[in-house]
Amino acid sequence: SSFLVEMEQIALLFDYFEGEIPEIRQDQLLIVFASHRHGDHFSPAIFDLAENHPKIWFVLSDDIWRKRVPEEFLCRTSFLGPGEEFSFQKETGEKVPVTVKAFKSTDEGVAFLIEAEGKVLYHAGDLNNWVWEGEPEEYNCRMSEAFHSELLKIAGNHIDVAFMLLDTRQGKDFYLGMDDFM
């Protein structure tokens, strides 16, 4: 679930929860995203990154409890719910224009659409077409409808990089979300 994107002036770290992170330049703005509260998408360890990165900001799904954020980082944290948008330039005075839009997940939390440095990136989090063998057809239909409803909100954006789900637990339907997105 974790991805690191390094751009010219910023670095974006998505859903970090464990493992070694490559060295990130200290002069870059580091924006750390957590799409939801599940342990494979969010870890309090993200706040330890501030030791080596004075220019750090956290963008967390609003399903992550505020009390999980250390007090000293609340002023550098934005909580986003579905349909909300955050502009770093407007809200923080950062010279690098970065805009983040949040979309409702079909599981927990949000997906992110980020515009930065002339590029558009999409991180799905757990927004997926969660069709499962053994679930009632009505459930799978509702899940597909909810997924397609969110995709319609994203449609029309020229996305340069997308981080999507391929979950083999879905059996033969593992590719549906990726296929629908493409």
Place the predicted regions along the sequence by residue.
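Active-site metal-binding motif and surrounding structural segment of the metallo-beta-lactamase
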Residues: 18-64, 152-163
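Conserved beta-strand hairpin/beta-sheet module of binuclear metal-dependent hydrolase folds
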Residues: 1-24, 110-132
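A short acidic, amphipathic alpha-helical/loop segment
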Residues: 44-52, 71-72, 176-181
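Cap/insert and terminal regions of metallo-dependent hydrolase folds
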Residues: 59, 132-182
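Metallo-beta-lactamase
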Residues: 60-118
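Divalent metal-coordination and catalytic microenvironments
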Residues: 5, 36, 100, 126, ...
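Short gly/ser/thr-rich secondary-structure transition/capping motifs
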Residues: 12-18, 103, 142-146
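Active-site metal-binding loops of divalent metal-dependent hydrolases
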Residues: 15-18, 36-37, 63-64, 105, ...
